[in-house]
Amino acid sequence: MALRRCADERVRRPATSAGWASVRAHLIAVLTFIAQLQACLSYPAIPVTGRLANTPISTTVDSVLAKDYLPGSSSHIAKSGNAAERIARFEARFGDRPLDWVTFKKISEATSPDFATIYFIKRCLSDHTNERVQAGYSREVERVKSLIHQRHWAQTIQSSLRGYKILFIPGFHYLSDPTSGADFLNQRTLMRQLGLNVQLAVTEEDGTIEENAEIIARIVRSESRYHSKIIVVSTSKAGPETALALGRLLRPSETTSVRAWISVGGLIRGTLLADRVVTWPKSWIFRVIFSHEKIEFRSLPGLTTSASRARMNSIRLPQHILVVQYVAAPLSGDIAGDVRARYSYLRKYGPNDGLTLLADELVPGGVTIIEPGFDHFYRDPEINLKSLAVANLVADELDDRSALQK
């Protein structure tokens, strides 16, 4: 009964700290100030209902064309010939373009950011593997929810997951601000109560990408001596740190125990908000602000888009590691009030989650799970049970792939 009460509390705890989210409030406040300098907060808000990524949607979008494009909406079903032809032209024009920020910036400029976000989701799920995994994720979420409702806690964990150690890589200032969710406390506690082997990697909370990647590499080497099956889970800033550790610092032979890497809202190719922080003359202003808030400025240059894209281009992840990116893909009506300024600033660059461009979260060769309806901070009351669903799904996927190789 004690286990049941504790687990119930963990699953149902309101996600005000954004369970999977990973950025300290002080840093966010600074980046919000940057965004507000030039952000235009005004854009259309057209009510719409429909479905995205197997999920019911009720929100607002920024253009009639986006409303027409949303699957399951009345506008989508009854769209005019002109709208259908225009959408078909865009799909044909961009259908063979890479899923990168350049493509989605062009789509946004020609249509609207919400249209581009819907196109991003559709393109991701047009991949057979992504479509299959997304469907599996939806089913697993419903299975876990049903078992929780019935209080069958032990059954929420798939047997395949129990054979893995789960190594969580925390986000920015996870020690100074435990309310941010950057330390995965809710997920770790719930999973531990359900009998899973979990560990938090102790990284430098405001260290550089390179410094923390070295720490992660050392931890993986050490844990690999005792565990042959490890799933690594990172969030936000820890995403590029993990990629660097697994894809450059460690030799492929040193990563054989790492079976999967789950990147949650990963700043894989940085954030344009960091670009503004490190650019003169703003850089000296923010050095003073950061010093006052006791935040290390030195970690930010590594989060710029130029540094991050160059770094990622030099990384080669071992093929045996299953990479899964869990991407929040909000429409404009899904953005929380305290995120709207950053989102609005980034809109001119294309679909974004309020901290980074959606395309910049993608890891080459990775499997994508879309979470529509939420911004970068995943303020979803069900985020903790969804974390179980993602972990279960990844373990099952690993088992299926292993069986096919035999």
Per-segment meaning from a language model:
Residues S180, T271-V277, D334-V339:
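Short aromatic-enriched loop/helix-cap "lid" or pocket-rim segments at secondary-structure transitions
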Residues I157-I230:
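Active-site catalytic motif of lipid deacylating hydrolases and related acyltransferases
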Residues F172-L175, E205-G207, S236-P240, G266-G270, ...:
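Solvent-exposed loop/turn segments at secondary-structure junctions
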Residues M1-W20:
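N-terminal secretory signal peptides that target proteins for export/translocation
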Residues I28-Q38:
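Bacterial N-terminal signal peptides
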Residues C40-T179:
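Flexible, membrane-associating and regulatory peripheral segments of lipid-active enzymes
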Residues E214-M312:
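Serine-dependent carboxylesterase/thioesterase catalytic core
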Residues I46-A84, P318-K406:
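C-terminal catalytic-base region of ester-bond hydrolases, centering on the histidine
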